[in-house]
Amino acid sequence: MAVPARRTSKAKKNKRRTHYKVTAPSVTFDETTGDYSRSHRVSLKGYYKGRKIAKAAAAE
């Protein structure tokens, strides 16, 4: 079984981890409802591309 010859330093470890980034989700403004929603998804009120395609979820 292979074993590392030397311990990985903090600098080496952190340089490798610089590529693990979180990106912000793309958000668009829906003119029909006046709310912001994520792209290519149905809004909470049931609209997609300005058309009503689903019933809105009932608030509990």
Curated annotation (Swiss-Prot):
InterPro entries in the cross-refs: Ribosomal_bL32, Ribosomal_bL32_bact, Ribosomal_zn-bd
GO cellular component, one term: large ribosomal subunit
GO molecular function, one term: structural constituent of ribosome
Gene Ontology biological process terms, A to Z: translation
Swiss-Prot/TrEMBL keywords: Ribonucleoprotein, Ribosomal protein
Keyword Ribonucleoprotein belongs to the record: yes
Presence of keyword Ribonucleoprotein: yes
Domain of life: Bacteria
Family note: Belongs to the bacterial ribosomal protein bL32 family.
NCBIfam families cross-referenced by the UniProt entry: rpmF_bact (TIGR01031)
Record HAMAP family: Ribosomal_bL32
Protein name: Large ribosomal subunit protein bL32
